[in-house]
Design a protein with these regions (language model features):
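Preference for long, amphipathic alpha-helical scaffolds in soluble/luminal domains
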Residues: 1-293
């Protein structure tokens, strides 16, 4: 949803179908009263839709589309007074906190070609509130700090170089001996989504060992690359080796859900993030891919 436009040679026509769905959802949400739009997870939903559409523009026409502008305007209109974007702490890590929603909104704004030069004072003020929130709110856990670094890698001046170095150091300290990273080491059971899944997480058979997973290993390598860490850095190379050694015959990389052991939907991002990580390290060969950065 966020990153597929960067791999058009992989997704082909499916990417266009995805964009059509985003546009339909934005059109639907545009008909919702603003007072209702600010409730539940809809502000973060709008941030994801806006980021997805902005990504299509950034990797495609390089121009801001009317649909993306509408999505961004709606997203900013749904913003909370403190600058965050409301979310529901029910399905971590992606539906986890207002802080998470704010980092997605920051991505959307930084990706959208020319949007910030076209906005009025209302949007300018909303962007300033978002920046202030991300600069002053304390991240809930190390997973949130990873997201902050990711957003800051595309938004100049969001955090200081010293803060970036500290987060990179933190990320490297989480690397497992096998070269991968585990999502579960980046937050305690009590801090994922206000602790709504703590009993499930503590009861997991791997609670004490917390093995590496595709979601976190792929995410971390993507973020480190976007933050300027070279692909030949020993930690990244160890992570790449883990990815190459742990893909399943089905094509996916396994990630256990933080929420349920019936449907492991996190395996979708747990497979897509590794693809992006490999691409950003020059390890994924396919026609029409954007060059690694």
């Amino acid at each position: 949803m966020q990153l597929a436009p960067a791999l058009p040679g992989v997704f082909g026509q499916e990417a266009q179908r995805q964009r059509d769905f985003f546009v339909t959802e934005v059109t639907r949400l545009a008909g919702v009263p603003l007072s209702s739009l600010k409730l539940g997870y809809q502000p973060t939903q709008l941030a994801y839709l806006a980021q997805g559409l902005a990504s299509f523009d950034a990797h495609g026409t390089k121009k801001l589309s009317p649909a993306t502008k509408q999505a961004l305007n709606l997203m900013l209109a749904s913003q909370s007074d403190d600058g965050s974007f409301r979310n529901v702490p029910c399905w971590p890590p992606l539906e986890s906190s207002e802080y998470h929603g704010a980092t997605v909104a920051a991505h959307a704004l930084s990706l959208a070609p020319g949007y910030l030069s076209q906005v009025g004072q209302e949007q300018v003020d909303a962007v300033a509130r978002l920046k202030h929130y991300l600069q002053t709110a304390e991240p809930l856990h190390d997973y949130a700090r990873v997201l902050l670094l990711w957003a800051a890698s595309h938004w100049d001046g969001l955090i200081s170089d010293s803060q970036k170095r500290d987060i990179i150091k933190m990320i490297l300290s989480h690397q497992k001996e096998d070269g991968g990273w585990s999502m579960r080491t980046f937050a305690t059971p009590e801090t994922w989504a206000a602790g709504v899944r703590s009993a499930k997480l503590i009861a997991e058979p791997e609670f004490k060992t917390q093995p590496s997973d595709g979601h976190q290993t792929g995410l971390v390598i993507m973020v480190l690359r976007d933050a300027g860490v070279e692909a030949d850095h020993p930690a990244i190379q160890s992570g790449i080796r883990w990815l190459k050694s742990n893909q399943r015959v089905s094509g996916r990389w396994w990630t256990r859900s933080l929420n349920t052991d019936k449907s492991h939907f996190i395996t979708y991002s747990g497979t897509f993030y590794p693809l992006m990580a490999l691409q950003k390290c020059g390890e994924l060969q396919h026609d029409h891919l954007d060059p690694p950065r």
